[in-house]
């Protein structure tokens, strides 16, 4: 019975505090590469999803809303490894959005969402063994990092003509992380702790254009206004005598040197660790006023000049990302008396390729998404 309880606890811990493989590449795993941005848009980031002519990830469509909208999305992610019976998963708030349309011509919106997940824990499998002074010594290394970046997003739209609409989104990035590099020498841990603070500013410009026969064309352009800066503080090396991972006074053993005997090194700044640029194109076709087919393509590049000066768990980073998406959606009709007409459906397929900057290897991902909703009334919950 006790063994079953222990196995259950270990399973829950691995489910709650696990990691994805891409967390160890570069600054961490970008949530934009993880899956859907929010529960309403599905795989779409430009084309309509649950409402005709509206995508909550595309500010140039916000003025088409009839009422103010508040959206909260919660997501989970699971990563499995080929040839291994391992499944890593984590979950959390994926997006909180508030949009206010103004006279069907303008709109403003505010949202907050996670941007990068930096959680990773690596332990070297190969332990170095050697004999010295008639004693067998073992050396192994480990790397642990936690934290990440959030994005505070402020957007607006303006209907230029009956067929052309413009949108803009400013992404204020901020966050922090902590990492420990440890060398275990025959039961004794020597640890180097580093703390980092991040801030940056990215802008996105959007265009929506109505063509003939219910065909819509979308595009967006991403430009970095202020590259993400890393303020890094390296702590003094210490011997973790009590094996708790912290530089402290906990008994029965005391870490060496004592915490009050040393000071941290001076904080230094790395001014350009994330500098993305990219563009997106999309096209959608409305059928019978309640169905939509859409295709989207995007490409993004990492133009950082200082990214290589940061210690990574894996000595690599994503230099280029290309994605292709196709989706099929059904809009809900809140005025219909038929229950089936009040149900919205969104589904899609996604293909992404990530080119690594150091080795130029390519990681390929294939994904699918399906979701549904129910419209209770014109103004209300869904």
Regions inferred by a protein language model and the residue ranges of each:
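N-terminal, post-signal peptide beta-strand-biased segments of exported outer-membrane/organellar beta-barrel
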Residues: 17-116
